[in-house]
Amino acid sequence: MKIINELQLAKELIRFPTVTPIDAGIMKFLEKKLKKLGFKTKILEFKEKGNAPVKNLYARLGKKSPNFCYAGHLDVVPAGNLSDWTINPFKPSIKNGHLIGRGANDMKSSIAAFVSAISVFVEKNRGFNGSISLLITGDEEGVAINGTKKVVDYLKKKREKIDFCLVGEPTNPNKLGEMIKIGRRGSMNGRLTITGVQGHVAYPCLLYTS
């Protein structure tokens, strides 16, 4: 079995212009990689009225518990004005030891790291106890209604249980890759009123034109 190089895979993923909700063939591409590692895969497409259809991928290796799931998304925010980039955002480049391209940080490199780590683990631990799965969505950067929630609902109907889940979003505000956080440590309810113009850092063009 061939070990998958995480940098090479990250570059390949960045080349897909997967601006939410565009798939551009990336789920099929990743599915093919996972099948070679022995995964059983399913591309799940969901659509809600008024929104474009979204493709997601669920893949699992093994049938036993516990099921350890890697979760993430392959869609990216718009690249904006291409003249503001020093490179084509969908043609990855290495500069000063950093991988540059749309989605390099959020979060195609994480997906590549998942798959690379799995390829190493499977090579060294054939016949391991338990299962490994990946839940990869395509609308995290958008309205996020046809991704994780609907995939989880689908899995519940199939009585597919995820025991543990690792989300590869960057978490350390100071140095990349040096922190693991618990996703939810509690909750708080309240009411907050904010006045002004609504906007989002990923979509400044909408703010300026509103």
Range-by-range predicted roles:
Residues 2-100, 123-128:
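Acidic/His- and Gly-rich active-site-bordering loop/insert found
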Residues 98-113, 200:
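Glycine/serine-rich anion-binding loops at beta->alpha junctions
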Residues 62, 193-197:
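Solvent-exposed residues in well-ordered beta-strands and their adjoining turns
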Residues 208-209:
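Conserved small/polar residues in nucleotide/adenosyl-binding loops
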Residues 107-183:
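Acidic/histidine-rich catalytic neighborhood of metal-dependent amide-processing enzymes
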Residues 77-79, 173-179, 201:
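A short, acidic/glycine-rich surface segment
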